[in-house]
Amino acid sequence: MAHTQRQQGGSRGQWSRCLLLLLLLPLAAQPGRAAIQIPSSYYISDLKIPPAITTQPESVTVFSVEDLVMRCEASGNPSPTFHWTKDGEEFDPSSDPEMKVTEEAGSSVFYTLSNTMDTLKQYQGKYICYASNELGTAVSNAAVLMIDAPPVQQKEKKVTEKAEAGHSIALSCNPPQSSMQPIIHWMDNRLRHIRLSDRVMVGKDGNLYFANLLTEDSRNDYTCNIQYLATRTILAKEPITLTVNPSNLVPRNRRPQMMRPTGSHSTYHALRGQTLELECIVQGLPTPKVSWLRKDGEMSESRISKDMFDRRLQFTNISESDGGEYQCTAENVQGRTFHTYTVTVEASPYWTNAPVSQLYAPGETVKLDCQADGIPSPTITWTVNGVPLSATSLEPRRSLTESGSLILKDVIFGDTAIYQCQASNKHGTILANTNVYVIELPPQILTENGNTYTFVEGQKALLECETFGSPKPKVTWESSSISLLLADPRVNLLTNGGLEIANVSHDDEGIYTCLVQGSNISVNAEVEVLNRTVILSPPQALRLQPGKTAIFTCLYVTDPKLSSPLLQWRKNDQKIFESHSDKKYTFDGPGLIISNVEPGDEGVYTCQIITKLDMVEASSTLTLCDRPDPPVHLQVTNAKHRVVTLNWTPGDDNNSPILEYVVEFEDQDMKENGWEELKRVAADKKHVNLPLWPYMSYRFRVIAINDQGKSDPSKLSDLYKTPADAPDSNPEDVRSESTDPDTLVITWEEMDKRNFNGPDFKYLVMWRRVVGSGPDWHEEYTIAPPFIVTDVQNFSAFEIKVQAVNKKGLGPEPDPIIGYSGEDVPLEAPLNLGVLLENSTTIRVTWSAVDKETVRGHLLGYKIYLTWGHHRNSRAQEPENIVMVQTGANEEKKSITNLRPYCHYDLAISAFNSKGEGPLSEKTSFMTPEGVPGPPMSMQMTSPSESEITLHWTPPSKPNGILLGYSLQYRKMQSDDNPLQVVDIASPEITHLTLKGLDRHSHYQFLLMARTAAGKGLSIEILGATTLEGLPPANISLSAEERSVNLSWEARKRHRTVGFQIHYFSKNGTKNGGKWKKTEMVNSSLQFFQLQGLTPGSHYRLLFTYKNNTFWETEIQTKGTSVTEVQPSFATQGWFIGVVSAVVLLLLVLLILCFIKRSKGGKYSVKDKEDGPMDSEARPMKDETFGEYRSLESDLEEKRTASQPSLGEDSKLCSEDNLDFNGSSAVTTELNMDESLASQFSRHSEGPEPFHGVPDNSPLNPAANPPATNGAPSFLN
């Protein structure tokens, strides 16, 4: 079977498929290159496309005649033609009779027809494919064809090896020479692999190496199998016999030695990107361990690995940085050996900036970059359509740069060609085809017509106008809202044809037109400007204690057209999501709630308002702060008698600056006083000088304060005691508090114990008379105030002093003060008492001052007593009343106000001191003049008819004189312009008045005032209107139940209550009657009625009548299932009729017994029964035929009478409710129209509704006695 081997050659220079589709993609133009990219939206038909190699011919090694195939494929429009070169010469396979050529659209394939390998050898060489059309020629990579014979097994002699245990040995494989790299397998005769280890391994040369031999290594079937993948063959060598003889002596350990490679140094050359293996196979006993290191740097962990029990160092995709020195070290207990590899890495050429195919417009300058790298550096050469471009053949418009780039100036259509850039060094060659396609294309606007652009105020507006053509079209813009558009400094015409408007506003709204100059091509666009999003109230910075709840609020407003704005919260630029498990973060409208804040919650919180057009944000901070930690390390220093220095170290302020420190002390001898504040210290101080009291035992503590509160107290300082000293001060507020005559009481404020300054503290009290006693002081000691001196006469002046004393001495000398002995009551009353009447409620009182000698104390003032009895001509005697008015000590006249007009007063005056009052002066009497009266006590009204109102009132409680009559004022309330009507009532005895001729459609305001000789008094006001004739109810609604119908309606405001009836009959056949029934009279003021006793599932007709006229009718269906007529059955049998008759007879007897029992044992008073509980609203109606109506007048005639109601259809046997003829029943409410429906009381009303209010005890109140059947149900009561 023939075997072939195909190899990919020149992979770095392989030119990828150069389809025009790549040209149609928008590529980033490189510097100096004015290329054209045809957009996908540009319409063009039948565009010619330069050829491009799509399938490169491949290098191949041929081992049989069937393997020779060369293939080349290319694209282009029109389809390209192909030709070949072999070793630089033209080669036409179609002219060779040993070749067969197959050419189809876009491909060229040739293969050999030879039958022998010798014939094929003439075709060895380097082949290049050329694909051409009218736009140029593309060149393929070079493909190398090699002819090689497949490897064959050589005849060999059988090999036998002998060695002693512990020695090393290598079994040779010697694979035959071939262009293919073999794979070596050492196996036994059963094709089982020889077990490899760090002692036994296969070298890169294929040999099997033993670092040291064991007797069990002896065998006669060590076979080397050589595998060639390309030809799919395996060659098996002759088996080798290995005999390991045991040593007569104990095997001696041997230090490591290199088996492969030999010597201490080797050199390797590798190409960039290839795989390299370094190998160290060693011998020794015991088996050495092998390690690797790089002597001149670090080994790459990603590209370098170890294999074959660390005997091989493998480089994958080797790079230039891997070049250097590598050392393998073999080591056992006997020593170590080394081998050093020097690795040199070179590179075949590779692209760093490959040329790119482009389209160009005539007249443009084209720069074709072609940059490659390699070791050694490659040489750059250019060809055009496969023809070399030398320096001598360059036109003036063509030039080469030092970097290898080709520049074409002012390109024309004739410059359209395919340029080949080739980079070569000793390791290989790479080639790239690049198209220079000079083309002219008609202009087109690619942006759609009628686009609408929406922006917000202040944004930069970008209007698109994408055009394409060759040469490049020139565009301009016009606007309906901005004249001379491009002259506006905010407007910028972009190089891509777009329009940029900076800082847009509502004035920029309108239609904008993009035009291609020199043509009639244009598109329109509309610009809409919306209000920008604004944050009205940004979140505020928060400073909170741990555990509190933080609330950030972000209020904003957006344009109504910007729907569904997104409020996004961030913490330190990271999005915040609402917590559902621990409720840490909660979004509440515009608010962010952070519960139970902790140190991890500190940071910058940002609210972002995001719409589809803009985004605004505002940030704030959350700082956790707490009470400060207590100060530490308290020390008392610099003790100087009564001054010490207290030092401390501040604690942590917990993010809230210290405001101040509070120094507190505790006296160890007076712990009952607790801790007291001694001094406050500024926050920047860490020590303070403290003034102390003598004779005290101090302990100090310090508390820090910030805006979060006070810290815990610090630890206590050491105890410090101050020595005793004489008092520094005397008691304060020394005074006399003498109350009893002939006694001097000296008192003062007791001194604080800390001011005692020493032991044995007491007070020295000193006193002497101010006049007549000489300079001598009386002295006495005491331990507490007061100090009492007797026998000193009444109200005498003394000088008094109190001095502090202790065991160490006296306090400072005190200043004397004046004190007095006890007072007594004044002896005389004021004289010359006078009264001046100023008006009906005010008088002026005058008097002469009393003699100071008679006061016998400090005069504090005068007391004026006023006594009044009753008004003149008052209707009842009033009890006497006394009023006292107090004046100052220096006053001799006083105005007294708020007296009662038209009243008799007695007046007297006395002087008083701290001991009491002196005698009263002689009384003087006076009478106050008349005043205007107060308002009448009450006023109410009734309305006898639609044009009359009667007012009733009571006289004023304070007439303040003789009533002369009343004045009534009234007017319509519809407008302030209505004239005020005045009625004068001459007699004070009149207490009611009827006004006639009033407008039934108007509301009135009534004002009533009483009159005396002093004038009219205050008024009482009432609002009201007349009462209209009664009308039947309106807006009736109903709801059906199974056995009843609930009816409700609206009572007519301002109208008198009326009675109406409800007539009903069942439409379900004769079983339910088919006969009209009616309720008794229903009161329209109830607004609710329940029609009971109906049959479930039945259809009823209802008529509502008033004054024998039907004012509303309807039909209803009760809920539930109707009862169907029972078909004749056993119930018609004679025996069943007899049983029923017996039961009926028994029930009749039982009913008679019940009546007998009630007549004997249930006696009651006829009078009590007549006056007993009765539905005050329910009165039975006389028997009337259908359509008749009972008048209200007849109802009034039967008021206060009772009648027996008819028994209901569902009466229960022996039920007291049914036997008691005066119990509640289904009767209609009777109205007492004499009750004052229009009666109004003197209180504010907003309209005519109060005229129809019903008192609780009124017969019109449904809560008084609710009907039991066919009336309002009990739940309304």
Curated annotation (Swiss-Prot):
Q: Which GO terms describe its molecular function?
A: cell-cell adhesion mediator activity
User: What are the boundaries of the region Disordered?
Assistant: 714-740, 1163-1216, 1232-1277
Query: Where in the cell does this protein reside?
Result: Cell membrane; Cell projection, Growth cone
**Cytoplasmic side: which ranges?**
1157-1277
- Disulfides per UniProt: 72-129, 173-224, 280-328, 370-421, 465-514, 554-607
Renumbered to this chain, the Polar residues biased-composition regions fall at 1232-1242
The record's annotation in Gene3D superfamilies points to:
Immunoglobulins
Give an example GO cellular component term for this record: axonal growth cone
Locate the transmembrane regions by residue number.
1136-1156
What residues bear carbohydrate chains?
A: 317, 503, 520, 531, 794, 839, 1035, 1046, 1068, 1083, 1108
Q: Which residues form the Fibronectin type-III domain?
A: 630-725, 730-824, 829-931, 935-1030, 1032-1129
Q: Per the record, what ranges lie on the membrane's Extracellular side?
A: 35-1135
Query: So which residues are the signal peptide here?
Result: 1-34
- Which GO BP terms sit in this record? axon guidance; brain development; positive regulation of axon extension
| Location (main, coarse) | membrane
- What Pfam families is this protein classified in? Bravo_FIGEY, fn3, I-set, Ig_3
The residues covered by the Ig-like C2-type domain are 51-140, 150-241, 256-344, 349-437, 443-528, 532-623
For bias type Basic and acidic residues, the affected ranges are 1165-1201
Primary role:
Neural cell adhesion molecule involved in the dynamics of cell adhesion and in the generation of transmembrane signals at tyrosine kinase receptors. During brain development, critical in multiple processes, including neuronal migration, axonal growth and fasciculation, and synaptogenesis. In the mature brain, plays a role in the dynamics of neuronal structure and function, including synaptic plasticity.
| Family of this protein | Belongs to the immunoglobulin superfamily. L1/neurofascin/NgCAM family.
Q: Fetch the PANTHER family from UniProt.
A: L1 CELL ADHESION MOLECULE (PTHR44170:SF36), PROTEIN SIDEKICK (PTHR44170)
What name has this protein been given in UniProt?
Neural cell adhesion molecule L1
Which gene underlies this protein?
A: l1cam
